[in-house]
Amino acid sequence: MHIAWLGKKSPFCGNVTYGREVTNSLLDRGYEVSFLHFAQEEADSDTWFGCQEVSLPFLYKSQIYTIPTLTASKVLTRSLKQLRPDIVHASLTLSPLDFLLPEICEELNLPLVATFHPPFDGKRRNLKSGTQLFTYQLYAPFLAHYDRVIVFSQLQRNFLVKLGVPLEKLAVIPNGVDVQKYSPGASNLKSQWNARHLFVYQGRISTEKNVEALLKAWKQSNLGDSCKLVIVGNGPLSASLMPFYGEEYGIIWLGFVADEQRRIEILRAADVFILPSLLEGLSLSLLEAMACGVACVATDAGADGEVLEDGAGVILNTHRVASQLHTLLPVFRDHLEWRTLLGQKARARVLERYTLSRNITQLEKLYAEVLRLQRVHLSTRA
């Protein structure tokens, strides 16, 4: 089977990781994959091996959205005609091209699958979640024209059904982690940072990630010199937060860490992983930390609460996150046995529900079903 994958290679975000892990796994299972992405010609050519690549022209791209050039749809159509894939899988990049894809693929008689990533909070508890609701409302009528739309949780599926996307169009296939790579193991980073207790945040430094609530709680808790908070990632709020939350409070800013093995070492050294988001989809960073056997704390935004339910971690309400963390941080510092138990439960939850291997097997079944329905559809038109 030949899969034309439309996704992202830069700038780094969860969508980039998702595309890399899934396409590499499909290649490992013997599929042919062509990778179409927004890039300048010859750019980013060293990240994916074994894929034929097609660069689509763009005016602007960020971690959140992409603005293609006016010729991008023509380049995409021409490329799909030349590649002649069996199926197109779009890991949606929040681009105007997303709305044209169903029409393009219908014209070429190509079945079309999408993965819909945008974070959400189905309870609409804050301004950010109201803004994100608009994205879902905007996309829902167009998602109905895709052959299948992959979402990461039952909660997200139910949310889209309420917005009018037919239930039969939606498939729940959660994010998955390579549990051989992301696993408990030795790390000497604690000694390097002179930390007895290590707390970690990994993700974008942006409003929806609510990192300032964590920083405020950390500063107010005054946990002592033996505790360190490591912030992995960058984003629009980094420059405004770093001057007020620095090393004098035991906070270590690492910025974006490109080396995956280094990120794994950080997670293996961590005692607690904290994700204070106001909005989420299903956080890969959270799953990676859980797979490494780290005790995890996250809000119930998006599907993260579903991941940690029934004792696999500590779930926060998106209201008053700083206050909740102010109470929890000293408890985590003082109770090793609880941290250890939560870490074991987190790893077990990932092994049960969120392995990359399981994810790819579900995806294979979805592709087979979509292709079967496509053949039936074409035969009835003949």
Predicted regions and their residues:
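Short alpha-helical donor nucleotide-sugar binding micro-motif in glycosyltransferases
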Residues: 256, 265-270
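Conserved donor-binding/catalytic core segment of Leloir-type glycosyltransferases
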Residues: 4, 192-219, 230
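Nucleotide-activated donor-binding/catalytic signature segment of Leloir-type glycosyltransferases, i.e.
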Residues: 239-258
